[in-house]
Design a protein with these regions (language model features):
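Catalytic domains of carbohydrate-active enzymes, especially glycoside hydrolases
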Residues: 8, 28-59
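Single conserved hydrophobic/aromatic residue that forms the stacking wall/gate
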Residues: 1-10, 14
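Active-site beta-loop-alpha junctions enriched in small/polar residues
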Residues: 57-61, 98-100, 151-155, 190-196, ...
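Active-site mouth loops of central-metabolism enzymes
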Residues: 20-35, 110-123
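Glycine-rich, proline-tolerant flexible connector loops at the mouths of alpha/beta enzymes
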Residues: 24-32, 55-75
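Active-site acidic/histidine proton-transfer and metal-coordination neighborhood
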Residues: 75-216, 220, 324, 342-344
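Histidine-acidic metal/acid-base catalytic patches
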Residues: 131-139, 158, 166-184, 201-206, ...
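Non-cysteine beta-strand/loop elements that form the S-adenosyl-L-methionine
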Residues: 11, 15, 95-98, 245-253
Length: 384
């Protein structure tokens, strides 16, 4: 008994995604209801060692039968079932306003729109999300990171680059003027170099978001390692950021040639990002979120594989003799540093990983997919 506007907005999120976002594939078993999505999450978490944190979008609001609230009128009650789910699994919740896939995205613009009615709608959406984020933090007892990202931009060369950014700046400042407990809500601003349909200009560039966060107390920058030129490495940016920001956030993903959001695997850049966080003693300063989607493969497998890959990267970083390697660098023993770096790559990390899984009561890598197949056969296939 979905309200017609709820149904239409869900269809827009699935079929008409805007803001340069794109996913490909149509693998069996896509969740079609909040209950199905929660079931898939529970199955994925069963395969994840350690502690997870839920991260949801404003578009995941759950309405009572026949109920509807547009994004500028969302309330905590529309996310009560997510809080119930998080409490059941002893998790906190991070939150994202959804500034895309909506009929009030005008000419590809939201917070930077020259149309004041459009901009006001999206400012009010951001303010509503501040209130919802504080609700999450109070209910779960865990601070809520609220990430502001929009796909605002232009497909071709703009005549005015500064005007949209000044409007964007004013809009975010108005959102952050909403009263909230700074110990409970951690707002951040995320940049992007380009997206499909906004190839020539993105309002929220890296320089914009870094500068905004630097000049606004309590607002963090967020770096997504898929949101830069392919030859830029977030692993190199992490220590630079740590020199100036007490805290910041990451979206950890895997871009293939562009911001493709492939499922995270244990590749070189993933390992390097984890190493920088660990070797710089920044595990308590960096909020780490995983950000990927691939509709061409089993979605439960994607969730769990990416999570396990990041856990492996952190384990490798924690087992690396960082103090010794730093000492070699500081004494200019670069040949020995190269040799030792290569030696570290052959340390028996796999045995430590297997023991960690055993202690967490989680299936090992060799039998991991057996559980995925079982769930696919018993649950996912029946959804089609």
């Amino acid at each position: 008994d979905l309200h017609p506007r709820v149904r239409r907005q869900r269809q827009m999120c699935i079929r008409d995604s805007t803001g340069g976002i794109q996913t490909t594939g149509n693998y069996m078993g896509r969740a079609r209801t909040p209950e199905q999505l929660m079931a898939d999450m529970e199955e994925a978490m069963r395969l994840m060692p350690g502690t997870a944190k839920l991260n949801i979008h404003a578009s995941y609001a759950i309405f009572a039968p026949g109920e509807f609230a547009d994004r500028d009128a969302l309330e905590p009650k529309h996310f009560a079932k997510w809080v119930e789910f998080a409490k059941k699994h002893h998790m906190g919740i991070d939150f994202n306003p959804t500034f895309f896939s909506h009929e009030k995205v005008k000419d590809g613009q939201t917070l930077s729109s020259p149309d004041e009615e459009t901009r006001r709608f999206w400012i009010n959406h951001g303010k509503a999300c501040i209130r919802i984020s504080e609700y999450f933090a109070k209910e779960t007892g865990v601070p809520c990171v609220m990430n502001i990202w929009t796909g605002d931009g232009f497909k071709d060369v703009p005549a005015d680059r500064m005007g949209p950014r000044m409007r964007y700046k004013d809009s975010i400042e108005q959102i952050l003027s909403e009263p909230y407990d700074h110990n409970l809500v951690k707002p951040c601003v995320e940049s992007k170099v380009f997206g499909i349909g906004v190839e020539s200009y993105t309002v929220g560039s890296a320089e914009f978001t870094l500068s905004f966060a630097a000049l606004h107390d309590g607002c963090m920058p967020l770096m997504d390692n898929g949101h830069y030129h392919p030859l830029e490495y977030v692993s190199d940016k992490i220590p630079a950021m740590l020199c100036f920001y007490p805290e910041f956030a990451l979206h950890i993903t895997r871009g293939v040639r562009w911001d493709s959001d492939h499922v995270l695997i244990l590749d070189d850049e993933t390992k390097e990002m984890a190493k920088e966080i660990v070797r710089d003693n920044a595990l308590d300063r960096v909020y780490m979120a995983l950000d990927y989607f691939d509709a061409s493969i089993n979605r439960v497998s994607a969730l769990a594989t990416g999570f396990r890959s990041w856990q492996k990267a952190l384990l490798i970083a924690l087992c690396t003799p960082n103090a010794m390697l730093k000492a070699l660098q500081d004494t200019n023993q670069m040949s020995k540093l190269m040799v030792m770096n290569e030696a570290v790559k052959m340390l028996p990390i796999g045995e430590i990983w297997d023991e960690y899984l055993r202690r967490e009561g989680v299936v090992d890598d060799l039998h991991f997919y057996d559980e995925i197949e079982k769930y696919e056969n018993e649950v996912l296939e029946k959804r089609n």
